[in-house]
Amino acid sequence: TVVVESPCDWVILRLLEAAEVRVIELPLLPGGVIDLQRLESLLESETVRLMLLSSVLSMPRGTHLPLNNQQAVAHLLGRHGTWVLENDCYSELHEGNDAQRLRDWLDPDRLLVFSTFEKFVGAEAPFGYVLSRHWRNELQRHFLLRAFRLSPIRQKAIARLLGGGRLDQHLLILRRML
């Protein structure tokens, strides 16, 4: 069983559905806050193996978890030994550089972090990453297999964008527009 914050990206929901994973949606309260009582109730009544949460920004609302809510959620999940899959796809769109990411409060041994460049560069940059302390070799193998299917020209273009600081300039403009 996987608990996801709701609203949740429909692509993620479809992937979980395709993998025949049981999904329980946990609606966010106004302001993007997680209902701690409801979460604790779910963790006690269900066999929750994984919780999918946003790192900084929760889309499509554009809200972020207040610091005290982040810490309380992390404490609850740690107490129950629940793995967390942190969606870091929209963090770069947050205005401030001082935003605390949820992973700052989580047990790194029960954490996976994923993100993509596609959300802020565009569909022509279908590149992403997954971070994990435990599955590094397996994840690296999967990413290498996928890399051979992607155009080397695209890979070089993204590398130049990242290496030349142009991505940071692009993000500044994008944040102002949002």
Regions flagged by a language model, labelled:
Residues 22-30:
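Short beta-strand->loop structural element characteristic of the AMP-binding/adenylate-forming
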Residues 32-95:
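Active-site phosphate-binding strand-loop segment of PLP-dependent enzymes
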Residues 3, 49-54, 85, 113, ...:
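Structural motif
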Residues 107, 112-175:
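Conserved core segment of the aminotransferase class I/II
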Residues 15-16:
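Short hydrophobic alpha-helical segments of the AMP-binding
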Residues 1-10:
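Conserved PLP-anchoring active-site segment centered on the Schiff-base-forming lysine
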Residues 21, 77-82, 108-109:
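A short helix->loop->beta-strand "cap" motif at the edges of active sites that frequently abuts
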